[in-house]
């Protein structure tokens, strides 16, 4: 979209407030507050700007929980950002957003990812081009239909005020995006995903972004509240490490946010905030038929109409 009528200050204020609200809620749920790490890029670095990382490791519930806010600018969009808009190659940019990944210790509690962001591409003598992106997706280790339906219905409700067609469109986008092509396997049960979005104009597109961000806590906390006291043992933890290995593979090979950060000279600690604290790989391993581990593959890691 080549409309320069946007207000980056309002977007920034919303994102910073969203990070604070989510971090406070997660700290209260865990019983351990998330530490704050404020950072700023130094002179001579490829990017300008800074951000704040809220992080919890080895908490009471979360083995690792990270939620980062960043607002950075650079002289040229990296390839991962203009893959669908080659005409923007070489433009300067500002990118601001909130991204989180939560890794509970209990294998019956799913990993979750959420991101909301805005990018602005600039070129002297031409109107700026802005767009929004984001979404959220759930990655269970053990599948529960009740949880999947709750997550997807909350996502659908967040998008409904902006058009009935958005949820099925963004759900399919999510199913297609969070897919490990080299494994022919989904990362999780999906959710919603969107990028390069400005078709509703700045005001309405920004309202949609806020609705997605605000839906995160009600989409996730009821699920982990239900599962947090489920007993587990070494078998479940071993399968959790195996599934986390798939998470690592996706993030390092396919994830646009990770590639954008690495290609643009971003802050490595923030970029790799999504990595699980432990992960594992087994050679040519397959779960025994009829087990809960096999059921995850056959019933949950396939596209379904959960809502």
From Swiss-Prot:
What the entry lists under InterPro entries is as follows:
Coprogen_oxidase_aer, Coprogen_oxidase_aer_sf, Coprogen_oxidase_CS
Origin superkingdom: Bacteria
Cofactor(s) recorded for this entry are: a divalent metal cation
GO BP annotations listed: protoporphyrinogen IX biosynthetic process
The transmembrane residues are: none
Where, by residue number, does a divalent metal cation bind? 103, 113, 152, 182
Keywords attached to this Swiss-Prot or TrEMBL record, sorted alphabetically, are:
Cytoplasm, Heme biosynthesis, Metal-binding, Oxidoreductase, Porphyrin biosynthesis
For the site labelled Important for dimerization, the residues are 182
Positions that bind substrate: 99, 115-117, 265-267
Molecular function as annotated in GO: coproporphyrinogen oxidase activity; metal ion binding; protein homodimerization activity
What Gene Ontology terms describe where this protein resides (cellular component)? cytoplasm
Q: In which pathway does it act?
A: Porphyrin-containing compound metabolism; protoporphyrin-IX biosynthesis; protoporphyrinogen-IX from coproporphyrinogen-III (O2 route): step 1/1
Name the segments for region: Important for dimerization: 247-282
Entry keyword Cytoplasm: yes
What reaction does this catalyse? coproporphyrinogen III + O2 + 2 H(+) = protoporphyrinogen IX + 2 CO2 + 2 H2O
**Pfam families given in the database record:** Coprogen_oxidas
Catalytic residues of the enzyme: 113
Q: Where is this chain's protein located in or outside the cell?
A: Cytoplasm
Biological role? Involved in the heme biosynthesis. Catalyzes the aerobic oxidative decarboxylation of propionate groups of rings A and B of coproporphyrinogen-III to yield the vinyl groups in protoporphyrinogen-IX.
Subunit note = Homodimer.
Q: Which PANTHER family match?
A: COPROPORPHYRINOGEN III OXIDASE, MITOCHONDRIAL, OXYGEN-DEPENDENT COPROPORPHYRINOGEN-III OXIDASE, MITOCHONDRIAL
Task: Give the family this protein belongs to, as stated in its UniProt record.
Answer: Belongs to the aerobic coproporphyrinogen-III oxidase family.
Full protein name = Oxygen-dependent coproporphyrinogen-III oxidase
This chain's source organism reads Burkholderia mallei (strain ATCC 23344)
């Amino acid at each position: 979209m080549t409309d320069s009528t946007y207000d980056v200050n309002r977007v920034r204020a919303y994102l910073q407030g969203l990070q604070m609200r989510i971090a406070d809620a997660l700290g209260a749920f865990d019983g351990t507050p998330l530490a704050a790490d404020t950072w700023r890029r130094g002179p001579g670095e490829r990017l300008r700007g800074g951000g704040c990382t809220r992080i919890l490791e080895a908490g009471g519930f979360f083995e690792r929980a990270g939620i980062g806010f960043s607002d950075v600018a650079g002289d040229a969009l990296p390839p991962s950002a203009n893959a669908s808009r080659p005409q923007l190659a070489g433009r300067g940019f500002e990118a601001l957003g909130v991204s989180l990944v939560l890794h509970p210790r209990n294998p019956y509690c799913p990993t979750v990812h959420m991101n909301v962001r805005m990018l602005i591409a600039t070129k002297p003598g031409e109107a700026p081009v802005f767009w929004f992106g984001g979404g959220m997706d759930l990655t269970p280790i053990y599948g529960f239909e009740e949880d999947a339906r709750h997550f997807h219905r909350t996502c659908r409700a967040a998008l409904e005020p902006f058009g009935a067609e958005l949820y099925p469109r963004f759900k399919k986008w999510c199913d297609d995006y969070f897919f490990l092509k080299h494994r022919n396997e989904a990362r999780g049960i999906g959710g919603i995903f969107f990028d390069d979005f400005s078709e509703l104009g700045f005001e309405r597109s920004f309202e949609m972004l806020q609705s997605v961000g605000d839906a995160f806590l009600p989409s996730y906390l009821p699920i982990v509240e239900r599962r947090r006291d489920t007993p587990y043992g070494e078998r479940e933890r071993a399968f959790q490490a195996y599934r986390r290995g798939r998470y690592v593979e996706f993030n390092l090979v396919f994830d646009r946010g990770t590639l954008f950060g690495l290609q643009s000279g971003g802050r490595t600690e923030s970029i790799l905030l999504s990595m699980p604290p432990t992960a594992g790989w087994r050679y040519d391993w397959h779960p025994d038929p009829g087990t809960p581990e096999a059921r995850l593959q056959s019933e949950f890691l396939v596209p379904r109409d959960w809502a």
